[in-house]
A protein has these predicted regions:
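N-terminal leader/targeting segments and the immediate start of mature chains
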Residues: 1-123, 133, 166-169, 179-197, ...
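Beta-turn initiation residues at beta-strand->coil junctions
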Residues: 58, 128-130, 149, 230, ...
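Short, surface-exposed coil-to-beta transition loops
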Residues: 112, 132-134, 235-240, 264-266, ...
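Short, solvent-exposed coil/turn segments at beta-strand boundaries
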Residues: 118-124, 139-144, 221, 244-250, ...
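Single conserved position on a long alpha-helix in the C-terminal lobe of the eukaryotic protein kinase
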Residues: 129-154, 162, 238-242
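Gly/Pro-enriched, hydrophobic low-complexity segments
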Residues: 205-290
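Surface-exposed, charged, gly/pro-rich loop-and-adjacent secondary-structure segments at domain edges
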Residues: 208, 276-315, 332-340
Length: 418
């Protein structure tokens, strides 16, 4: 992990977004920075960061109610889901419901939370600071931990199969060569950051209006503001505001606005931040006394299958390049293996792209959709039912098809009838 820059903004936005999303109000003190174009702000974001720590405030206004999964799942529904799980995952569904993990995930996406983040080249630690408790995720080169202080449960997984330095160098070299080959086809000089920024702006500009907003302060730091406004008429997204640290180029704050409401639907941003490298001890964890310890272990059948695949790969491809025909053969093999599973398709592109599923995955019991609590989340529309939020809609048609996207309900209905 030579460059933290490649994943630091994703940690502050993506990790925390899969964990929720947000921003903080702009601070009143005036900021006077040199004027930059959108391309120049993007170049600023290419700077390398080796470590940081800070407190993120996460809020979202999605209109999601509090859900208690245990009250939504009958014993028969749980049993049905168990039977459909792969061998070795028999206890997965009961444990998930007993620990209320799904409820916690939904609750984390909605509402407001404070999240403490530590990151460096040797690890990452995320602490969700609840009112009466705390949840931690710790990742280093050797292991991963999650800790729920409220329920006194710790879960760990070891990273046993490490990539050797030689293999890592080869992977990086192959990736760089592939990228350079692709760039050559585009007639793009990837050694020229300005050229890359211009190319990205040209691509983005086909679907999005991008501009630079007011200079301001976030977490005590001066920042530029990139504003993206979709050109698509059927998008639920009105605009996205990204605050970029004027010195480090790190994304400090993100706001996502919906056409459905005035307040941001998603906000994720730093309340405080330091770019000093956190102490390595923060990326280790010892469960407190009295903690229930769980170890994530791969089911024996799956582990054996992966071991077989590894041997096949080493025997077949270790001494030669993988060709397109090799990929085609593997694709055909996987398609045959999962032929009975509904396959997602992408309809359209850009801000109006829609994911289509010909059926609800068989692992989801249909009785769950008829549960009173779950049914309250669905709105009846001509041709089906819709689960709606300010930034995404999911249409389940009367015939069992599923359409989902960050688009209006009317647009989903149009796509469904094409």
């Amino acid at each position: 992990m030579k460059s933290m820059k490649r994943w630091a903004p994703a940690l502050a936005v993506s990790t925390v977004i899969a964990v929720g999303s947000f921003a903080i109000p702009l601070q009143a003190s005036a900021v006077d920075l040199p004027d930059l174009t959108p391309q120049q702000v993007m170049l600023l974001m290419d700077r390398e960061i080796t470590g940081f720590s800070g407190t993120i405030v996460k809020t979202s206004d999605l209109g999601l109610p509090a859900l208690e999964m245990s009250s939504m799942m009958s014993k028969d529904m749980v049993k049905e889901m168990e039977e459909k799980m792969p061998d070795g995952f028999d206890e997965f569904i009961p444990n998930l419901i007993e620990q209320n993990a799904i409820t916690q995930a939904v609750e984390l996406i909605s509402g407001t939370h404070k999240i403490r983040v530590y990151a460096s080249e040797v690890g990452m630690r995320v602490q969700v600071l609840d009112r009466m408790s705390q949840r931690d995720v710790i990742v280093n080169e050797n292991e991963m931990w999650t800790y729920d202080a409220k329920n006194a449960i710790a879960t760990t997984a070891k990273f046993e199969d490490k990539i050797s330095a030689a293999d890592k160098t080869k992977i990086e070299a192959d990736a760089k060569a592939s990228f350079q080959e692709y760039a050559a086809k585009l007639q793009l000089d990837i050694s020229n950051p300005e050229a890359v920024a211009d190319y990205l702006m040209k691509m983005i500009g086909e679907t999005t209006n991008v501009s630079v907003g007011k200079e301001h302060r976030i977490a005590g730091r001066s920042a530029y503001q990139l504003i993206a406004k979709p050109k698509a008429q059927n998008s639920l997204i009105d605009s996205v505001y990204v605050s970029v640290d004027s010195e480090t180029g790190m994304a400090l704050d993100v706001k996502v606005y919906s056409i459905e409401q005035e307040n941001p639907a998603f906000q994720v941003g730093f309340e405080s931040i330091s770019f000093a490298t956190p102490d390595a001890s923060l990326f280790t964890f010892t469960p407190p006394a009295g903690t229930t310890l769980q170890t994530l272990e791969m089911p024996a059948e799956l582990e054996a299958e992966l071991a077989t695949l590894k041997k096949e790969y080493e025997a077949k491809y270790a001494s030669k390049e993988i060709t397109e025909s090799d990929f085609a053969a593997k694709k055909a093999e996987l398609e045959a293996k999962y032929a009975d599973q509904p396959k997602p398709e992408m309809i359209g592109e850009g801000w109006e792209s829609v994911i289509y599923l010909p059926a609800i995955p068989k692992e989801v019991p249909m009785e769950m959709l008829e549960n009173e609590l779950f049914a309250d989340l669905l709105t009846q529309v001509p041709g089906g039912k819709v689960f709606s939020t300010p930034v995404a809609n999911v249409l389940i048609t009367d015939t069992g098809n599923v359409y989902a996207g960050a688009v209006t309900i009317e647009f989903l209905q149009q796509v469904a009838t094409r």
